[in-house]
Regions:
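Short acidic DE-rich linear segments
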Residues: 109-112
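Heptad-repeat amphipathic alpha-helical coiled-coil interaction surface used
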Residues: 17, 23-26, 30, 37, ...
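Short, charge/polar-rich alpha-helical segments
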Residues: 2-27
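Acidic, low-complexity, intrinsically disordered interaction modules
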Residues: 35-99
């Protein structure tokens, strides 16, 4: 499971935990945008589309920042390859966004 692999590699590393926290914040923001998307009118979607795209880009950037750090610490970070890269297949962008929504969901459940 990708999330379990992430958490194992992050461990108690304070810098990795900070990067993970930043990722969770942007993932939660992105998930909120996605959750409301179907409730928006066409006009509202048009107005908010660039913001959604920007937030999605930020999610990808934060995943990459965490991976870069973990690799510098000698971790495999193979979970990032499992998510895929937009450059290899445009569909991977959607998968990364979906995984960000999953992270926000898990975070919400754990907040009980």
């Amino acid at each position: 499971m990708i999330h379990a692999e992430m958490l194992t590699e992050i461990g108690a590393d304070l810098e990795a935990l900070k990067l993970y926290d930043e990722l969770m914040k942007v993932a939660t923001r992105y998930a909120a945008i996605r959750a409301n998307w179907l409730l928006l009118s066409r006009e509202e979607k048009s107005e908010q589309d660039s913001g959604r795209t920007s937030c999605h880009n930020s999610v990808i950037t934060h995943f990459n920042m965490l991976v870069r750090y973990l690799k510098q610490q000698g971790k495999a970070a193979a979970w990032r390859d499992e998510l895929g890269y937009e450059e290899d297949n445009p569909y991977n962008r959607k998968a990364i966004g979906d995984f960000a929504c999953y992270l926000a969901f898990v975070n919400g459940i754990n907040a009980r």
